[in-house]
């Protein structure tokens, strides 16, 4: 799967751009603040309905413009599709697929599986459990057709339960919510556990290449004691939940814990090693998707050279090439990505929001 063409209008500092893209590596080179990351963010937004640097649509719409518009041509298994997304300052979102309106953002995410590697991506390792839940949920979303609807319903029900906790005095008054929550919670936890077990070998193998000096271990924590029945636990903890005014246990508290030599990775690894581990996790997840479904991810790498020495950059470049996936890489100079440049690559020069193809020597 590859994005063959990208049109950007009034997104960040980019007034207008129409890019014919390479199926392999696409390099975005230019000084800091030129708009390189904005191109990556436009691609990410086209596949997620939101930017990765801001959750507020108004902040990514170009100054004094009413909306941004993104459009792409997607080549998926020799079938070409068109996808489009626009967002106004009022928050109105329009999704178009193959010329028809009324589609959901989740459909874009299904069409355009992406792995994002940014300097802020360390939160996967040193941020809270929600970032590692998101890692598992990306895999469940792309591997389990019923996951998205189940998780959306569970989040809605938990929100309603938490609101009810502020008003009720007896457990019987919220039992109706729990009767709907329990089967969803158990199903989602089973999907997450199955996915973490299935991908464990891929993660271990990739991490062994990137960080052979450490013995890494991974464990899924479902969000409540594995020996406890979730329904009974919700009833037992009602008084506590009512005092807290939120549901303290469940899939929304799950985690995917990562240790190196028995120690949490954020307490042991350097920033360069953490970046390698983050890259290994993203690569392993993308390769697992390809093996399971035949679909390839898009890989988006922002500020590629930061935290990595020449040898580590070369190793990452080799592993990315081996995926045969489409890759977008931003860097300050062409020299930083010299190890990645090949016959299927394309170099773009970005300055002041203007993007031009740069001939390769």
UniProtKB/Swiss-Prot annotation:
Keyword Cytoplasm assigned: yes
Intracellular or extracellular location(s): Cytoplasm
GO molecular function: ATP binding; single-stranded DNA binding
A UniProt-annotated Pfam family: SMC_N
Keywords for the protein's UniProt record, in alphabetical order: ATP-binding, Cytoplasm, DNA damage, DNA repair, DNA replication, DNA-binding, Nucleotide-binding, SOS response
InterPro entries with a match to the protein in the record: DNA-binding_RecF, DNA-binding_RecF_CS, P-loop_NTPase, RecF/RecN/SMC_N, RecF_2
GO biological process, alphabetically ordered: DNA replication; DNA synthesis involved in DNA repair; double-strand break repair; SOS response
Annotated Gene Ontology cellular component terms: cytoplasm
Residues that bind ATP: 30-37
Stored NCBIfam families: recf
Protein family: Belongs to the RecF family.
Role noted for this protein: The RecF protein is involved in DNA metabolism; it is required for DNA replication and normal SOS inducibility. RecF binds preferentially to single-stranded, linear DNA. It also seems to bind ATP.
Name of the molecule in the record: DNA replication and repair protein RecF
């Amino acid at each position: 799967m590859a994005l063959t063409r990208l049109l950007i209008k009034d997104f960040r500092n980019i007034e207008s751009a129409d890019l014919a893209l390479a199926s392999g590596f696409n390099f975005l080179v230019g000084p800091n603040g030129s708009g390189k990351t904005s191109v990556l963010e436009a691609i990410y937004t086209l596949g997620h309905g939101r930017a990765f640097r801001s959750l507020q649509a108004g902040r990514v719409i170009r100054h004094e413009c009413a909306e941004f518009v993104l459009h792409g041509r997607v080549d998926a298994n020799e079938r070409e599709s068109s996808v489009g997304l626009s967002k106004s300052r009022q928050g109105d979102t329009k999704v178009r697929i193959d010329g028809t309106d009324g589609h959901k953002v989740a459909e874009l995410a299904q069409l355009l599986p992406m792995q994002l590697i940014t300097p802020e991506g360390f939160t996967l390792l040193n941020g809270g459990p929600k970032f590692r839940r998101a890692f598992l949920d990306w895999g469940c979303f792309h591997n389990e057709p019923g996951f998205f609807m189940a998780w959306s319903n569970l989040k809605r029900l938990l929100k309603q339960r938490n609101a009810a906790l502020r008003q009720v005095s007896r457990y019987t008054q919220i039992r109706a919510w729990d009767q709907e929550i329990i089967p969803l919670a158990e199903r989602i936890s089973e999907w997450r556990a199955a996915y973490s077990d299935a991908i464990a070998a891929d993660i271990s193998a990739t991490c062994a290449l990137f960080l052979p000096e450490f013995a890494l271990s991974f464990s899924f924590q479902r969000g409540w004691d594995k020996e406890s029945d979730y329904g009974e636990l919700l009833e037992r903890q009602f008084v506590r939940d009512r005092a807290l005014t939120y549901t303290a246990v469940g899939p929304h508290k799950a985690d995917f814990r990562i240790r190196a030599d028995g120690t949490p990775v954020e307490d042991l690894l350097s920033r360069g090693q953490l970046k390698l581990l983050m890259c290994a996790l993203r690569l392993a997840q993308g390769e697992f998707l390809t093996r399971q479904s035949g679909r390839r991810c898009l890989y988006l790498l922002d500020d590629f050279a930061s935290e990595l020495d020449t040898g580590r950059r070369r190793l990452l470049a080799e592993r990315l090439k081996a995926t045969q996936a489409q890759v977008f890489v931003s860097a300050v100079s062409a020299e930083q990505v010299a190890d990645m440049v090949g016959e299927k690559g394309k170099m773009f020069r970005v300055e002041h929001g203007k993007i031009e193809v740069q001939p390769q020597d």
